[in-house]
């Protein structure tokens, strides 16, 4: 579960290393987000020469959470870290590579470009 002020690792090569959640998108007064949800973030730590800089306000989709998610068959999937991928307005990733596994739930959110770039889909 991701909420305001949560810090997440960035799982792409857009130049950001760590982001801080500003807002969870999708409904009035929505408090938490899970895998596949879009959030508004600010970049807290960035690599030099990257596409995004420190202080930029960006949109991101959550690809891994420590709390995990329950699937329809009754199984749970959890990860070791909270991670996101920075996206453009058309739901495509800003970077050209995705690092680490991503959850299968991104398919239902129409993030097929992220799923196809990921090295592993769990």
Swiss-Prot record:
GO terms for biological process: translation. Keywords: Ribonucleoprotein, Ribosomal protein, RNA-binding, rRNA-binding. InterPro entries: Ribosomal_uL14 (IPR000218), Ribosomal_uL14_bac-type (IPR005745), Ribosomal_uL14_CS (IPR019972), Ribosomal_uL14_sf (IPR036853). Gene3D superfamilies: Ribosomal protein L14. CDD domains: Ribosomal_uL14 (cd00337). It holds the Pfam family Ribosomal_L14. GO terms for cellular component: cytosolic large ribosomal subunit. GO terms for molecular function: large ribosomal subunit rRNA binding; structural constituent of ribosome. The keyword Calcium does not apply. It comes from the Bacteria. Part of the 50S ribosomal subunit. Forms a cluster with proteins L3 and L19. In the 70S ribosome, L14 and L19 interact and together make contacts with the 16S rRNA in bridges B5 and B8. Binds to 23S rRNA. Forms part of two intersubunit bridges in the 70S ribosome. Belongs to the universal ribosomal protein uL14 family. This is Large ribosomal subunit protein uL14. It comes from Staphylococcus aureus (strain NCTC 8325 / PS 47).
